Amino acid sequence: MVKLIRHILLLTLLGLLFSATASGQGGFVEIDTTFSKKVQVRPTEHLLGVRYSYEMTGVHFAPDLKAERVNTYKNFALLYTYYHNLWDVWSYFGIQFGAKYCQYGFTSYYNIDNMDQTLTAVEIPLVTQLKLDVGRHLRFMLDIGGFGGYRIDTTNPKGFDEFDQRWDYGALGGGGFALKFHPFELHFEVLYQYSLAFLYHPEKLSTEWWLYSYPNRLSFNVGLHFNFD
């Protein structure tokens, strides 16, 4: 009932305001329907490039196993980027995806059952890339998206067992800038990945208490891209 009264009062006030405005215009409201402002729309762009990453990797464990990060340098990606105009008006949007070869892992204070390892994986990153072009040679970028992957190898001498989760997926985001010298572009980005899939099945160490394990990575990236447009 109170909400209904509020709605009625609001509609009444809006009606009074409209009436006052209309009366101030001599009973007629003239609306200019012309739109003379020119909107400059940038053409679509297609980029193909390679990216190298230096990554600071680790795993978040619960309960805490005092895991320490492992830094990796064998990380490479092949990427396709498509920049487009949203509704033919805003030229700030793009989509990027590709294939990545990467390594990540951890060491721990306890090293229970020789769990310390560095994993090798193949991934498919997919992000929405927001961009802002400044002049002819500079572009700022913001990445928001995710990734999926599969762990193909491990440094653990025992290899994978039934408690190791080999499929992976998670969130991916970051930002950076690009230096443009058409048709080539140099991209510099800092990205963060957080896996939403466990590294291990929760019962890997015990059926009495579960172990949760989430890999995460902070990467520093440089890429060389070719602009086809």
Where are these predicted regions, by residue range?
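Transmembrane beta-barrel strands of outer-membrane/channel proteins
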Residues: 50-56, 97-103, 142-150, 177, ...
